[in-house]
Amino acid sequence: MLQLRNEARCLPGCLDHLRGHVDGIVALDDGSTDGTADILRREPMLLELLSNPPSDDATHVWRENENKRRLLEAARRHGAGWVLVCDADERYEQLFLRHLHAAVDSLPDHQLASLSLVSCELWNSPDAWRSDGPWGRKSRARLFRLPQKISFESSSELHGPWLPDDAQRHGLMFYSRYRLYHLKSIRHADRVARRDLYTRLDPARQFQAIGYDYLAQEGPGLQLRRIEPDRDYDRRTLPPDLQAAQSPNPSVLAKSPR
């Protein structure tokens, strides 16, 4: 399941890395003005494409909870029992994708179970992720059982979870060490753009008390972990400009635990 806006740069690789591991794709194009919708329409795995009217960044209104509700209802129309969520600028590690169906089989089918993954922000390079401070403690619930009732009344409109209300209140969360890698933290320019976007959307820090400056900060405490060969994602699915990013300085690398 994909919610996207102006992701023509990262979307082709995202679809490539999911293909063959999921049974189908339901997507919502949130008013894109680039080629995002055209890329989705060409995808053989696409079951349904939802859309919002095109809008420029100055006038676009983010309605994340409504988008999520529409996506989950579409997934249910297509017979989905379990949902895997992915952003266009994210890549699941190959180990997780190989184990995906076994992971679903291992979770309780009669309860609103969900699986959380470690969220790894790639930093300055496609082969290293940031692990100091809040960066080393991020996790995301991205695989979950689809509930009968789909609502997001208790979720914030920005940075809210993908889990519907019933799953948050009554479900069981299982925490895994599988990894989800974020691509738009590789380049400094992308980190600054992300910081500026969220600062504009949430100037009073209503949805995140820590604010957003940290998204682009480094400092002397910067610590990176190189991705082990058996924990990698499919780097062939990176956009060309990110494939060319440099490897990290050895002085900021820490030994990565399994």
For each feature predicted by the language model, list its residue ranges:
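Short, structured coil segments at secondary-structure junctions
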Residues: H21, E43-M45
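Short beta-strand-to-loop acidic/aromatic patch adjacent to the donor-nucleotide binding site
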Residues: G79-E93
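A conserved acidic beta->alpha catalytic loop
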Residues: D29-R42, P53-D56
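Short, well-formed alpha-helical segments that are part of the catalytic scaffolds
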Residues: N6-D23
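Active-site nucleotide-sugar/metal-binding loop of Leloir-type enzymes
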Residues: N65-W82
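Short beta-strand/loop segment that forms part of the nucleotide-sugar
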Residues: D23-G31, S51-N52, A88
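Catalytic-site signature of metal-activated, phosphate-bearing donor transferases
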Residues: V61-R69, E93-R258
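Short hydrophobic beta-strand elements that form part
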Residues: M1-L2
